[in-house]
Amino acid sequence: SQKGELEDKVYCIYISPLKALDNDIEKNLEEPLKGIEKIAGKDLGIRKAVRTGDTTQYQRQKMLKKPPHILITTPETLSILLVAPKFREKLSNVKYVIIDEIHSLAENKRGVHLSLSLEHLQHLIGQYTRIGLSATVSPLEEVAKFLVGYEYGVERDCKIININYLKDLDIKVLCPVSDIMLADSEDTRLGTYNLLDDLIQENKTTLVFTNTRSGTERFVYNLKKMFPKNYNDENIMAHHSSLSKEVRLATENKLKEGKLKVVVSSTSLELGIDIGYIDLVVLINSPKSVSRALQRIGRSGHKLNEKSTGRIIVTNRDDLVECSVLLKDAKEGKIDKINIPQNCLDVLAQHIYGMSIENPWDIDYAYDVIRKSYCYKNLTRDDYEDVLSYMAGEYEELEERYVYAKIWIDYKENTFGKRGKLARMLYSTNIGTIPDSSGVLVKCDGETVGKIEEDFMERLKKGDTFVLGGQTYRFNYGKGMTINVSPANGPPTIPSWFSQQLPLSFDLAMDIQRFRAHMDTKFRYGKSKQEIMEFIYDYLYVDDFAANSIYEYFVEQYTYAKIPSNQRLLIEYYKGFGDRRFVIFHSLFGRKVNDALSRAVAYIVARQYNTNVTISISDNGFYLSAEGTLGGLEAFKQLTPENFKNILTQSLNKTETLASRFRHCAGRSLMTLRHYKGEAKSVGRQQVRGKILLKFVQEMDNDFSILKEARREALEDYMDVNNALKVIELIANGQMEIKTINTVIPTPFAFNLVSQGYLDVLNQNDKAEFTKRMHKAVLEQIKEKLKESDL
């Protein structure tokens, strides 16, 4: 620029995951550019502009005539620009590509698609510098590989600059009552709001994170209702993804202008949208991973040398232990590992279509370009050719279901290219990896009784019962975005809160398990309360109240039963009300792992014992329940490292989980088009078509590439089959023993699982009362045990 040699071309592409972030970046570039011009002593004429799906046709034409030197965009828009002939020419001089919030892209299919686009861009223009900006993430080396990709099977060079150690953290775990177990639910509720109000009033601006959208709305409503002098419509607002873009933008602007005392959010403010200065971040209950905790708390003191201040409010003993270990890991820099999806065949199909639009490709060369992406470095030739075969319409049966060829293949010349004049339009209007979603209507006897979320519907299979509006219903069948139910009695098989829960990370779960093992050792070696309390103070960063609550929790579990840990899987046989029996697996591995384990066990039980099984899962374990005999342990022991994945895969057939995942994959791979000739297809129509296609494909070829991807996504992304397999291996090689116990009252560690699942029909007050009654009964049992042992 100083030499006056800037051409009308793009030199730098800045990619962020959110359109709102793009707009922030453009504004925030103004000052640095002015500073550069001031140093240079002249107007350098460096242009910047945002290009997203919201950019008008007029603005796009303007960019073609005079393109920005710094182009700010999203992953999806970059993919479209790579196949736009006129604008593609403007990218020929790109020297830098900057990816903001790379951690939020790397862990999902948007990142997978972006990694292919980066290789496509390199194919077009040659070498360029890639820069990734990330919040706290681990392992940095893997994210670096994701950023730069591979060359001839060897990872490209990447310099890593880690500045996390420069950030000063002030994090504490707080409890709203002096004794979590003895306080009733109303005391805990009032204590939570009083504590939260105190924290907000002590600071200028506070950001509060709940883990659900419903929780966000509830906290805003109750703060205004309970403290009308402190909160009103002018100084407190909610921010979550279900609110309109206009409402979210108004909240962000008010925050920047310092007009808000507090904002309550679910997850929508985790990424680095510019919201001005935040003094304090409060997390209501566990954020379920160290990286998420640090990301949220990092919104306070957002500048490099400023302290980040966070408080985590816990409301039960499981949360207290979980957050105390999380706090230890955060302070000691131990971050959960990121999971980057591999070999996603639906995204590959979409990208191959995009490549074909540019010009014909040599099949071997295209394979080499694709495998330069970190996400496809291990892509097999068979999978690649299967996707090409599908895209070329070689499954002739699919034409019966209106799935037509998108590309042609010339095997003699070993090339492929686009088919049809509408290719660019179809690609541009159907690009992307985020599936359309909508509320699912629940109908009973022809009457609509409410809505559930689609990811909740995924859990349902015929005969499952759940609670909606205080009533229990039995799931009969689903059709499109409507499900048919019947009134039901008895406990629900699927807890109604399931769909909005954040899953506990496997790494944090295993650290909690290790703490459990340490505590178990102290008790077994006869250490005194004082010695164990000293260990808790030394090991965790907690105050007197918290340390004592943790001690009491563990001493009750140890005295009444056994302490499960990373060395011991405890299986508890508990007889519930009536003839109902429970097999409780104390498997603290996180909900995604427990989802996989419980499905596999339930599948064996249902197949071998012909029993209608109820499942309830949490981060801390799962239970199977049925009337009469239940072979839960016997079924679990049949799982081996060799058969586990196959059994879990079989359990997915005829489930809503597979149907929903297939619908998403069919959309990404362009089997179903979300938009065609200007018409958008409703989610309901997509759902119906997805189910018809799934059944057709299963009969046509059970190893069809997109069906194969739907299974992979369900197993690896929706559940966590790989870490579940690690658990099976730990047991198989003797590193984790299985111990069983029989109880007339659930053990303390099982209280929350039993009350949240089996008693989902109860309100929070009744659940708390039930838990207190169980706790009292356990203490009576412990007294009897102590008398018998003369301790």
Language-model segments: what does each one mean?
Residues 367-370, 374-439, 452-453, 495-497, ...:
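Extended, highly charged accessory segments
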Residues 416, 479-496:
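Short, solvent-exposed secondary-structure boundary/capping segments
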